[in-house]
UniProtKB/Swiss-Prot annotation:
Pfam families: CADH_Y-type_LIR, Cadherin. This is Cadherin-3. Glycans are attached at N200, N566. The gene is CDH3. GO terms for cellular component: adherens junction; catenin complex; cell junction; cytoplasm; plasma membrane. It is found in: Cell membrane. SMART domains: CA (SM00112), Cadherin_pro (SM01055). It comes from Homo sapiens. The keyword Metal-binding applies. The keyword Protein biosynthesis does not apply. The chain crosses the membrane at residues 655-677. PROSITE patterns: CADHERIN_1, CADHERIN_2.
Amino acid sequence: MGLPRGPLASLLLLQVCWLQCAASEPCRAVFREAEVTLEAGGAEQEPGQALGKVFMGCPGQEPALFSTDNDDFTVRNGETVQERRSLKERNPLKIFPSKRILRRHKRDWVVAPISVPENGKGPFPQRLNQLKSNKDRDTKIFYSITGPGADSPPEGVFAVEKETGWLLLNKPLDREEIAKYELFGHAVSENGASVEDPMNISIIVTDQNDHKPKFTQDTFRGSVLEGVLPGTSVMQVTATDEDDAIYTYNGVVAYSIHSQEPKDPHDLMFTIHRSTGTISVISSGLDREKVPEYTLTIQATDMDGDGSTTTAVAVVEILDANDNAPMFDPQKYEAHVPENAVGHEVQRLTVTDLDAPNSPAWRATYLIMGGDDGDHFTITTHPESNQGILTTRKGLDFEAKNQHTLYVEVTNEAPFVLKLPTSTATIVVHVEDVNEAPVFVPPSKVVEVQEGIPTGEPVCVYTAEDPDKENQKISYRILRDPAGWLAMDPDSGQVTAVGTLDREDEQFVRNNIYEVMVLAMDNGSPPTTGTGTLLLTLIDVNDHGPVPEPRQITICNQSPVRQVLNITDKDLSPHTSPFQAQLTDDSDIYWTAEVNEEGDTVVLSLKKFLKQDTYDVHLSLSDHGNKEQLTVIRATVCDCHGHVETCPGPWKGGFILPVLGAVLALLFLLLVLLLLVRKKRKIKEPLLLPEDDTRDNVFYYGEEGGGEEDQDYDITQLHRGLEARPEVVLRNDVAPTIIPTPMYRPRPANPDEIGNFIIENLKAANTDPTAPPYDTLLVFDYEGSGSDAASLSSLTSSASDQDQDYDYLNEWGSRFKKLADMYGGGEDD
């Protein structure tokens, strides 16, 4: 066969349908092979050249219809492939020599793609094609199929007759569910061995027009400006059809407008593109003011307009264009405005506009065309009512002009879409006279005056004028004078000095200027006031001497470093530098002072040794005008060399030691006094009263043999003063018992009266109801000779209470009076 020299074209030829085919005839019309290689000689081929035969038909049968997926080729007479256009070799052909001879093998185990229409009516199962292997001459062959639609979902759609190989369709197909099935055919021998490779079986479901078109929306909405030209696009509608629109017309949708409402100005205002569904304006005359909205009934028809139809609604909104000019209503106005009123509303202008409210074509824009030479007025648009609001930008002057005639034009925010006449209004403004405030001339007056002028010296005259035509009297006074330096004559406006003007006063003077505000008042009805500003530029005089800074220095007394002090002078040139320095009050004995060449610093040096201490250096500085200022510099001299790093404090032992000794002596005296007090408290004198005094007899009843563990009783628990009294619970429901306080006699000056003083005060103490019983120091653990204490056995004495003498209770004071009365009168009972 040789090596090919031209391009090779591999074509997949699809059988579309068979017109007539008799399965029972021995001749079968089939493709030569599943893949056929055709040779085109030469680098360039002319159209119409036959390349080769690919299909073997049967005599007497009508030819089959074929199609190819390559537009460069066509099938002639149902069998021969030929070129449709001129072909050129696209890429250089690479030839690889080979000694192997290429041979073409005939294959019978091939089935062409099978086309089956959807929605078939049967009867089922329906034979589609027969699988045939050429190995059936040698052995018995059994056929089977696998794949989706056979043994996998959807199962059972197709089947095969096991022995004959007929491919069967078991139920109707739906192309919209599955458009193509890919199955595999198998051939096995009786013993189950495969005799053929699995064969691909393609089943194409051909479409039928079983679906109507569907619009994507029930209602479509679009908009277009009024007055647009024909051909302007409005919107696009879309309908879909599930049927095939590639190989058939079943899914090809054609659009049309069924009706239009309203039919104004006529019934064909819009058109729709048949294929794309684009709605456009076809006629002029869209006017929103007449028809703001159109409703179109649109329809979609499949089969390219010859099939099933569905409808939807398209609403077209006509947008407003500025085709109507605003008009003043009315066109003439008169208004009255008081003079000097700023921001005063003069008049509201009303307009009408047929365009859509609150749109740019409706919102008005006002412009003052004439009559406002002084730019006294302004006009704005009210955002809701669309009215024009005329207000005063400046105050009007009745004396200058008492009437203004204004001309105002109105347009819209959006430009007109066509040439339209504009509307103009006339406003006559009458100015009303009012009492105007006096006006200082000038409003801000600058006056130069020398600082420090004498009190009562005139500064200037500052007066105001009355804008009114009437001759009104004006009075003056100072409204604000921060330092209180000035006074103003109420009739003439004469300003005089009442204080010392000081240019260097930083609290009230800024940049040599002292600001004062003055007031003028007329006698009109009602009276009005005006203010003016008086700016006094204070001229400097040499009233301040130079001073050094800083005024405290620290310097070493050995190899000292010179101290540089800055010189400041509050005055201005020429009352400042050059400065001169001089030491006074014998400061020049140990110090020197020199002014540097620039004249802005003074150098202070220590020329003799000084011991560490603080000294006063008297430095006198004078300026160019010989204004002298004496300043005392506090100089701290340290025991050090050169620069001062640390300055140790001087030893002050001569002062500290006496102070320390005095403190120690005071502490020693306090310690001795404390010891004496403590020793005095420890001395206890036993109180031995007469033995016949029954009050001192303490009977010890605790002796019960063996002795008591506690031999000493804490007598401090019995000797309680007034400070140890229990707390009194306050009550507000019981009247308190008032106990009289005893009256003690003061100590007499005469020593002879001491005895009476002791007796009287002892009696007062004994009768004191607030004192505790036995207000004496009792020693209960004293049981020496003479003690009347006995054993507890004395309690069993046969003596009765009647043998006891209780008269001594009367001697115990008022607190035991009740007890003495109870026991003292027992025999009488």
